[in-house]
Structures are given as C-alpha cells and as structure tokens.
Amino acid sequence: MINKGKGWRLATVAAALMMAGSAWATEYSASFKNADIEEFINTVGKNLSKTIIIEPSVRGKINVRSYDLLNEEQYYQFFLSVLDVYGFAVVPMDNGVLKVVRSKDAKTSAIPVVDETNPGIGDEMVTRVVPVRNVSVRELAPLLRQLNDNAGGGNVVHYDPSNVLLITGRAAVVNRLVEVVRRVDKAGDQEVDIIKLKYASAGEMVRLVTNLNKDGNSQGGNTSLLLAPKVVADERTNSVVVSGEPKARARIIQMVRQLDRDLQSQGNTRVFYLKYGKAKDMVEVLKGVSSSIEADKKGGGTATTAGGGASIGGGKLAISADETTNALVITAQPDVMAELEQVVAKLDIRRAQVLVEAIIVEIADGDGLNLGVQWANTNGGGTQFTNAGPGIGSVAIAAKDYKDNGTTTGLAKLAENFNGMAAGFYQGNWAMLVTALSTNTKSDILSTPSIVTMDNKEASFNVGQEVPVQTGTQNSTSGDTTFSTIERKTVGTKLVVTPQINEGDSVLLTIEQEVSSVGKQATGTDGLGPTFDTRTVKNAVLVKSGETVVLGGLMDEQTKEEVSKVPLLGDIPVLGYLFRSTSNNTSKRNLMVFIRPTILRDANVYSGISSNKYTLFRAQQLDAVAQEGYATSPDRQVLPEYGQDVTMSPEAQKQIELMKTHQQATADGVQPFVQGNK
C-alpha cells in the first residue's frame, strides 16, 4: 500500500503474496490523501514502468482511496478514472509514452482511432468512425451531442457526403453512443406515391404542403423528422411525388386532391384601376412578365399575350386593357395573380416630373457705311459700281423709258430695292449718280422658354411664325401669267428635351434647342428672298436639380471693307473719290444658352413652382395697369391671386345674374320682367 500525507509517505507496491510461477500476477492497492496530482502521476508511472509527460497546465490536489487490490489493467483504468474526475485525460503516443493533458484539449490531440474489433474500454480517449445507412447524420448528430461528455473532451461531427459520424470521447461513452446509433439506424416503411395534377402547379403545391408540414411540426406535432413525409415536385410532368410512412402519405395525398381543383368557377378574374400608369402601355410590360412566369412554372403550361389565352399550371392567363376606364383586366390562377398584382403595384406609381428652363441671351451690334460715285456718257462709256446701290446703267435705262414712253415701272423697281440716298446730275452728254448709306443695327434678344415633362418622356415647345419663301416660278401655257411656288419656313424658339432622373437628384438631359429669326432681305432683282438667322444647340448634359449650367455659346466679330474703283483714277488723292465706291461693315455678336432643370417629385413642389410663375405674370399685369392709369377701371382684366377663381368683368357678372333670375322665375311659373336700356 502507498500512502502520502503530513510529510511522510508509505508506499507498498509489492504483491501481498509472492509465489513462484507465472500463474500469480502483481496486484496494487492505492490510497492518496490531499496528494499533489503530479506526485500521483509519477507514482503510477513508476509502478507501471510507463514514461509519462505532464502538461504544464496540469495542477491540483487529489483525494482517492482504493480498498481492493487491483491488477495491472485495473490499476491503469483506476488511474484514467481519477484523471477524468479531475478534468484530465491520457493520450498515448506511438512510442509508448503517455501524455497527460486537459480533457478539453484531448480531442485535438493524437488520440487513437478505434473500430469494431478494438473499441477501447473505460476512460481512455478514443475516436470512432460510425457509418449510418438509414438516417441522416445531419439530423442524428445533434441528438448524440446531448448524450456525449462535451465538457470533458467529447465531440460528435457529421460528414454528409459519406453519411458517417465521427465520435470522440471516453471509450465507455463512445461505445454507448455507437449502440444508440445502431438502434436508431433502422430502415422504415418508405413507399412512394405519384399524384398527377390537373389544375394546380406542382411547384406551388409542394411549397404549400411543405409549409403546412413545417408549421404542424413546429407547433407541437409528434411526427419525427424520419417519419415525416417527403414531398417533391416533378415539373416536367406536373406531378407531386410523396414518400413516407402510410398514414403520413395518406394525409398528404388527401390534401393535394382537395387543393388540385379548377378555380375558374370560383372567380379568378380581377380588375385593376390604375392611378398613374396607362393601361394600354402596362399590358405590354405584363407580356414580358408572363414569359418569366412561364419559365418558372414550365411544368404547368405556357404564358399568354394580351387578350389571348394559354395555360399556366392548368389554368388560363389573360391580360387586357380597358382604355375608357384606364383599367387592367387579368384572369389567372391565384399564385400567378399575386405575382402580377405585385408588378402592377410597383409600376403604377406617381412618376417624378422635370421643369426645364432655358435662357437664350443674344446681343448683336453692327455698323455700315456705303459711298459711291458713278459716271455715264450718252455716246457710250462710263463707270458703274453695284456695291453701294443700283448701277447707273439701270437708272439710265429706267429714266430713258420714262422719258420716251412715260413708263415708271423701271424706276419703281429700282426704288423698291434701294436703301439710303441717291442723287443724279447730268450736263450735256454726261451724267453722274451719287449714292450714300449709313447703317447702325443693335439687337438684344432674351428668350426664356420653359416646359414641364415626365421622367423619360420627350417634350417639345415651339413658339414662332411661318415665313413664306419663294422656291420657284412657272409660266402659264399662254405665257402671260407667272405662278410662284411658295414654301413656308417656321422661325422662332424651339425646345425639345428628354429628361432622365438619376440617383442623387441629378438629371440627364437630351436637349435640342433652336432659336431662328428672319435676317436681312435680299436686294436686287434676283428674287432670292430673305435670309434666316439660326442658332441651334443639340447635346446631352448631366445637371443637378436646381443648378444652372451653360450649354454653349458664340462670340463673333466680323469686319468687312470693300472698295470698287477705276484703275489709276481711283487712286488720285481727293479726286479719286469721284471714281470709286466704298463699303465698310462691322458686326459683333455674343450668344449664350443656359439650362436649368428642377425635379418635381410631388404635388406641393409642382404647386409652388406654378405659384411663382403665376405671381410673376400677375405682377407684370399690375405694373402695366399702373403705368397705363387703369388701376380703377372695371373693364381692365387682371389675373386674380393664385388659387382664387378668375374674376369676370362686371358685364359678364350682370348677364349671369340675369340668367339665374330667368331660370328661377321659369321654375316658379312666373315670367320675369327685364327692363332693357333705352
């Protein structure tokens, strides 16, 4: 016997009776009172001739006592049990050395893997691989963990691909868990039934039945996961496959039969009255949704187009639009109807609008000076310049025609196409024509077109006039009448814009802006007609709501000087002016185009913008009234304040009152007396 306490130790490890012969084995009796655990381990190692390594974390005191004599195997199991009680375990190494560690660390150490032939005994740490054939290890593992010594180093892991369990722990506990697995791993009565559906969708039916079974088990159902029926959809044949024990299968089959009914007689048509969207356009969108539904429910049929009829899951799907009430009429099975209803609800929303304001600023300034002197001789010869007015030859012919025939047609034609001053002198055979013209043009154009449109909707604004332009002439068959062909060209302010609202209150604007006007009228007898000044901007810009940005601009300055003269004579100082014609023109033009979008997401913002525009226009009317002195005149029409009814003239109000009086008297059977003005 070995004893330790109070500074003395008594160890007796010899056999109580030593007898010759191999029939007698060594026996041990051990008792430790308040002994250090390291001393206990060292004593056992010495008695069993084992080399034992102690982990530094192994500390503490033990109190154990054995009243029986133990053989070597029993003595070793006694050693393992004592360590187990105090939270430690022994891990045997390949070289025969034993390692003492904490129990929770033993499962990650090199503990032996045992099998059916050598399962291990007692409290030695082992790992065992247990194959399972009839039960899912995923469902079985949580149950075994509750039976294992998890705090003492036990562990249960499942491996789904091979459907095996890896159990780690004390050999006695592991063997007990293996026995539990053997008793549970029994093949059940798993027959299969196939139900062919006529009306419902197999996928939706399985989803519904699975949810019902799940809810029943979660609310206290006594059907185990092993005995719970399995329901699978075969969408290729639109069938439901049910497996499980007979009673569970019968209940599922009855449920499926009751749900697989024709719902047309139960009313599967609904009318959706749209608030914001257009029913006709919505139908086109729902066609694409129907194609997606067809793909999801391929086992049940095909989708339909608007007004058509095809089946999905054995039911009919039809979508049409009633434009008079702006409504959608949809016929579909309940599950399909629910999906389409969600799509309609998300599409039928109030779309944001965009107020687009453009500012076109153009400032032009031009100066011109034309001077010319022309000579002619009745015997032939002369000088003629047309850059400063009519030629002297045309004037001479028109004057001779007037002198000989008294006809003024030629002179009228020349006067019609001439600007400025013209003076003629003649003496003997010589005639002189002096022309002079000075021009000074200034223009300041400010255009502010604005338009409100829906998001992703093109809108156009056009204010202008149609100007006739002669494109050709044609003589009649008799030759005495000339017909002119006219084409009208629109000039003014044109704005075409398509806004797209992006995230962060930014707007992508596709803009086409044009400002055109009638320019200078062509002079002379060529009949080419007027010229047109056109300013066009066409681009796409990204602008934040409420910000003003420039779209483009032009700064143009032109200087033109033209001199026509008689060689040599025109170069003589001072006298040379009598033999030449000069034309000087200078023009400057500055043009800038700005744009500002404003997002209108709700009615309040829209109303505020409208109020500002309305109030500005009314203020301009009031200013005009004050300037004209009509502030107290009842005949002057002024817009009322924003939100109030339009004020009618006193004469119109009088006529309405007379009409009401007449209607009331007619209803009472009395002929009203109305005195007219005399």
Swiss-Prot record:
Q: Where is this site: May serve as a pivot that allows opening of the central gate for substrate egress?
A: 464
Region spans: N3: 267-348
Record key words, sorted: Cell outer membrane, Membrane, Protein transport, Signal, Transmembrane, Transmembrane beta strand, Transport
Stretches for region Secretin:
353-602
Q: Which residues form the signal peptide?
A: 1-25
Q: Which Gene Ontology terms of cellular component type are present? A: cell outer membrane; type II protein secretion system complex
Q: Which cysteines are joined by disulfide bonds?
A: none
The family database entries (InterPro entries) matched by this protein are listed as:
Bact_Secretion_Sys_Channel, GspD-like_N0, GspD/PilQ, NolW-like, NolW-like_sf, T2SS/T3SS_dom, T2SS_GspD, T2SS_GspD_CS
Segments for region (N2): 189-264
Where is region (N0) located? Answer: 26-122
Q: Where is this region: N1?
A: 124-188
Q: Which residues form a coiled coil?
A: none
One GO biological process this protein is involved in is:
protein secretion by the type II secretion system
Return the annotated region ranges for S domain.
604-678
Chief subcellular location: membrane
Assembly and binders: Forms a cylindrical channel with 15 subunits.
Under NCBIfam families, the record lists:
type_II_gspD
Query: What does this protein's UniProt record list under function?
Result: Involved in a type II secretion system (T2SS, formerly general secretion pathway, GSP) for the export of proteins. This subunit forms the outer membrane channel.
The name this protein goes by in its record? Secretin ExeD
